[in-house]
Amino acid sequence: MAGLWKTFVLVVALAVVSCEALRQLRYEEIVDRAIEAYNQGRQGRPLFRLLSATPPSSQNPATNIPLQFRIKETECTSTQERQPKDCDFLEDGEERNCTGKFFRRRQSTSLTLTCDRDCSREDTQETSFNDKQDVSEKEKFEDVPPHIRNIYEDAKYDIIGNILKNF
């Protein structure tokens, strides 16, 4: 009878473990894993935290799950033993738009993630090229010794000649 109980407990334990392994992750959990993986590569630099996420319209566990979310720098650095969720955002912290795919099949998972800077937030500085003086080719090389000038000119014409040979 004791052997039957041990077998029963073993079967129940295996069933629980297999159910947990096959449990479908929620989108929020996948995004948390993606941010955790992104922050692991930032030794000594500020950690990023979730700002907003856009879940996919449908989630099929047999296919790639598209990821789309925004993250922002926090006050915590990766050397500290703190979770980014416990950290405040930096006031002028960098924001990034992240896209990727999460794929899970049986026991293997795959995550592809790209986080690009949010250029729409950055202030653009317009520079006028009219303010700069137009410097001629000869004026650029007035202070350069003649031997160096000749080497430069020869290299310039060799490069142009090689480019034109390809056409």
Swiss-Prot record:
Region entry Disordered, spans: 122-141
Compartments it resides in: Secreted; Cytoplasmic granule
UniProt GO BP: defense response; negative regulation of angiogenesis; negative regulation of lymphangiogenesis
Species name: Mus musculus (Mouse)
Protein name: Neutrophilic granule protein
Molecular function GO labels: cysteine-type endopeptidase inhibitor activity
One Pfam family per UniProt: Cathelicidins
UniProt keyword DNA-binding present: no
Gene3D superfamilies, alphabetized: 3.10.450.10
Entry similarity comment: Belongs to the cathelicidin family.
Induction context: Up-regulated by CCAAT/enhancer-binding proteins CEBPA and CEBPE and transcription factor SPI1 (at protein level). Down-regulated in malignant tumor conditioned medium. Up-regulated during early bone marrow differentiation by the granulocyte-macrophage colony-stimulating factor CSF2 and down-regulated during granulocytic maturation.
Key words, A-Z: Disulfide bond, Protease inhibitor, Secreted, Signal, Thiol protease inhibitor, Tumor suppressor
